[in-house]
Amino acid sequence: MDKTTEVIYNEALLKFKTISERLVEIANLMQRGEIIVAKEELDRLYIESVHTETKKCGSRLARMMEHILKLAYCDDYNEILRNGRIWKNDAIKQREEVRNLVQWKNKHQETNIINNINDLLSETYERAIRYYNIAMKDNHSLALYEERIPLICIWKLEDLLDKEIIDLVEMLPNQTGYYPKYVKEQLDAREKKLNAAKVLGTSSDDI
């Protein structure tokens, strides 16, 4: 188990222990016939859980949006070649975490958490811009077009959780066009490899 996984594991274990202790206390209240107090404690525990999950989702969405802004407003195509895939993959990773946390479009979707995230989306976007500005201090290719970044979030939560990264980039005004160019070149290169494989009788899995 690496250090990052160990930290996550320990945090989850502590959270599980805390919730278990609270549930035992609530069960004891019910056994003593203090039903109203038990219900109040259970409601409080649920509200705390929703708040915690909302905060966690907000942090992940902010990171996701930060990476999309980088893809849209980086002024150096060579930087896109170096880091474009990294930024895109991390944006996807953050999104998948959020989708899993809220059970996005599943039968037992976490409606309360989703509503909270929607209410805080503007604040989350502002945090993404702050993250971008911090990254800009170490990566000067993010500085030139920083003023093009919209001050108001143009995405809806549904956009962020459902659309492809390239589509989210292209929704932004005055983006450099470097990332769409990069994606097109990658798709063209992949198609050439697939066509070459067909000619040579090679499986595409071998590419």
Per-range role (PLM):
Residues 1-59, 69-207:
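Surface/interface-facing alpha-helical segments and adjacent flexible terminal/loop regions used
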